[in-house]
UniProtKB/Swiss-Prot annotation:
Biological role stated in the UniProt entry: Binds to 23S rRNA. Forms part of two intersubunit bridges in the 70S ribosome.
Cited InterPro entries: Ribosomal_uL14, Ribosomal_uL14_bac-type, Ribosomal_uL14_CS, Ribosomal_uL14_sf
PROSITE patterns in the record: RIBOSOMAL_L14
GO annotation terms (biological process): translation
Keyword annotations from UniProtKB, A to Z: Ribonucleoprotein, Ribosomal protein, RNA-binding, rRNA-binding
Descriptive protein name: Large ribosomal subunit protein uL14
Disulfide pattern: none
GO cellular component, one term: cytosolic large ribosomal subunit
Length: 122
């Protein structure tokens, strides 16, 4: 579960390495974000020459969480780190590649483009 002030890794090649959650989108009572939710982030660490700069504010969709997700068959998928993919104003991925695995639950949230860019879909 991701809340305000949580630090996440970036799973795409947009140039950002670490980001901090500054707002969870989805209503006034939405305090934590889960897999597939959209959050507003601030870039805390970026590589030189990347598409994004330190201090920039973007939206991002969460693709991996430590708490994981429970599937209807009862199985649970958890990851070692929290990660997200940065989105532009039109809710399209900024990067052209997604590193690491993503889950099938993103398809239900209408993020098929992220699934097609990912190395592996679990």
């Amino acid at each position: 579960m991701i809340q305000m002030q949580s630090i996440l890794e970036v799973a795409d090649n947009s140039g950002a390495k670490k980001v901090m959650c500054i707002k969870v989108l989805g209503g006034s009572h939405h305090m934590v974000a889960k897999l597939g939710d959209v959050i507003v982030i601030s870039v805390k660490e970026a590589i030189p020459g990347g598409k994004v700069k330190k201090g920039d504010v973007y939206k991002g969709v969460i693709v991996r969480t430590k708490t994981g997700v429970v599937r209807p068959d009862g199985s649970t998928i958890k990851f070692d780190k929290n990660a997200l993919v940065l989105l532009n104003k039109q809710d399209e991925p900024i990067g052209t590649r997604v590193f690491g695995p993503v889950t099938r639950e993103l398809r239900a949230k209408k993020y098929v483009r992220i699934m097609s860019l990912a190395e592996e879909v679990l």
